Design a protein with these regions (language model features):
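Iron-associated oxidoreductase/ferritin-like identity signal
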Residues: 1-186
């Protein structure tokens, strides 16, 4: 019987065989990288919760456009969570739905919200950087490419939040209603 050669990007652990017969070839994901990417679901879903809570707080202080911006961004974070789930499904890995933590809501003003949101995005960016590093460490190139995609999104989000902080600083925090009128989610 002729030996079956698999493409280099398909690891042997991703092949299910019955004797010499290949039953299924699934895209490989290293088990240690899988654990990290599973955590990405929680990171993104927690982000959605945080931004939804921030939007609710901003509504309570009558900054309706900014509240809408944060609630729209919460939906964007849920979309990112779905990307992580879909990536795992495409790898024939069952995505594990995490428990979502109640966000801390100790904001006292808009500045606290903006600062907290930016710091949270830095945290998420660090997570995806570490995930990309681990994927490379285990030569899991598909996972690495996925992590790079998530990092591209993170760069965009850091720019968005940085822009909000710049707008806030231009208004010196005094003209919050004028600030609020200029906030629109892309």
């Amino acid at each position: 019987m002729e030996e079956i050669k698999l493409p280099e990007e398909v690891s042997q652990e991703s092949v299910k065989k019955d004797g010499d017969q290949i039953l299924e070839v699934s895209p490989a994901i290293h088990s240690k990288v899988e654990v990290i990417i599973q955590q990405g679901i929680k990171i993104e879903q927690d982000s959605a919760q945080i931004y939804e809570a921030m939007g609710t707080y901003l509504d309570s202080i009558y900054l309706s456009n900014t509240a809408h911006w944060f609630k729209t961004h919460a939906a964007e974070e849920r979309k990112h969570s779905n990307w992580v789930i879909k990536f795992l499904e495409d790898k024939n890995v069952m995505a594990q739905m995490p428990e979502i933590a109640k966000p801390e809501c100790g904001w006292k003003c808009l500045r606290d919200v903006l600062k907290g949101a930016y710091e949270h995005e830095e945290h998420v960016t660090n997570f995806w950087n570490k995930a990309a590093t681990e994927a490379l460490k285990y030569a899991d190139h598909d996972s690495y490419q996925f992590c790079l995609h998530m990092l591209k999104e993170q760069r965009e989000e850091l720019e968005l939040f940085s822009g909000l902080i710049d707008l806030y600083n231009l208004s010196k925090g005094k003209s919050l209603l004028i600030f609020d009128q200029h906030v629109q989610h892309p």
